[in-house]
Structures are given as C-alpha cells and as structure tokens.
Amino acid sequence: MPRNGAACFKRLAHNLAIRKYLQNNIAIADSTVFQGTLYEHTVVRELSEKLLVKNLEVCGGSYDGGIDIRGKWPVDQIFKTARERFDLSAEFPKKASVNGAQFKPVRHKLDSKSPFRPLNVLVQCKAFKNAKITGKEIRESMGAFSSCVPASRRTQYVLMLSSPNMLTRDGLNVMNGLAIPLVYIRVEMLKSHQGWFDLENSGKLQNYYENEFASKFLQNCGVSQWLKFKLYQSLSQEAVSKTAGGLSGLEASNVN
C-alpha cells in the first residue's frame, strides 16, 4: 500500500533531523554517547510514524531521571481508524486488576463523549548491539517510572522500553509481573550502507509487546490491528495532520 504524501513528509522531517545530528556529531561517531543519542532519534521517528506519538522530546541527560524520550499518545486516533475497519468488541470490564492494581481500561474514555486526553509516554532506550533485555533492565525501567510518576497518576502514563534486541525469558517474566503499563518496542539500530547510515531501510520498528497490565489497560483500542495491518500507511491527510507533533497479552506483534 503506497504511503501518502503527508506520512512521507513526516518521515522526511524526522530523517532530516537525524541527518543533522549525524553531520553535527560525526567527530564522535565511535562513542557510546553518539550511538545512544542516534538510537533515541531513530526511536522518535518510529514512534511518531508508526504509533502516532506526538510532542516527542529527546530529554536524555544527567538529570533525566532515567527517561530518554517524552511524548503524548493520542490513542483515540488509532482507535477511530481501526474501528472503521475492524470489529473492536465493546465487551470489556469496568475495572481490571493486574498484580494487585485496579484500574479502568482506556477504552472507557474512548467511548465517552468527552474529548480524549492523550496518554503521557515515557521512553527508555537501551541501544545494546547484541545483548538481550533481562529482568535487570526491566527493573531499572520500573525504578525510573516510579521516580517520575506518582502512584495515583500511573494510569495517565505508558512506559515504553526500546531496544534493538529481544527480551530474555527472565525479562518477560519480570515485565508481566509489574503493576504498570509497560510496552516493549524492538526498534533496529541504523545500519551502515556505502559509508553512511541507511535511514530508509533500517532503524525500523520490528516488534511491539504489551505486558499484562498494558494489555488490559489498552484492551480493544485497536493498537494491535493498527500495527499488524500497517494502518499508519493508509491514514488520511486529515488524521495525520491532527496527530503530527514532533503486542497484546502474551502475543508480540511483528510490525514489519
């Protein structure tokens, strides 16, 4: 399915930002700081294009509290588009309970007549070349989330952890044992091609996985269908302009 002009423009804008970062920092291209920040910019591009996260800001630094990227997630845009193409069941509990925490699924807000307030997104990036994500990294992410978000506001946020590699079994178990909405996204690192970085054919979102809490929190919002059928490629000009701003249950969604 061909990508529409607005979506192309948004991707072009992000690629220009990445190229600018590369040109301004090529002298330190071998450093871990360079690779880490480049990966963060790549994750920003994929979150904006593939999940419509807006107002994305790379904030990694000494005083970031362990959070590398912040943004706003208008899940209602995904829901409206997915609902036009799929039967998103309206059967879901008034309240869900996971690991001792009770909460209302987001779908309740989507079905109400009140304007939907985008979810706050906090992202941690682990630009590991080969290492998989273990329980240790998951616990570190939980610590960063807890230090930034009061317990009373946890259902206004989604924590995302991004890495180029897969989760270990231990990492998966720890992730599903948390009482916060945590989404694991596997985004490739940019690959070299003919002496430069291949921005078009690498650095893509490969997998999206919701822990048990996030799965029930985002139940029947259409995110899995959105990614599985690449609805972001067919988004209308109007929907893209509104959202441009800057794996359910135990099943992981393959994006590409």
Swiss-Prot record:
GO MF, one example: nucleic acid binding
Keywords: Mitochondrion
Listed GO CC annotations: mitochondrion
InterPro entries the record matches: RRG7, tRNA_endonuc-like_dom_sf
Pfam families (alphabetical): RRG7
Compartment(s) where it occurs, according to its Swiss-Prot or TrEMBL record: Mitochondrion
Lineage top rank: taxon: Eukaryota
Protein family (similarity comment): Belongs to the RRG7 family.
Protein name: Required for respiratory growth protein 7, mitochondrial
Lineage, broadest ranks: Eukaryota, Fungi, Dikarya, Ascomycota, Saccharomycotina
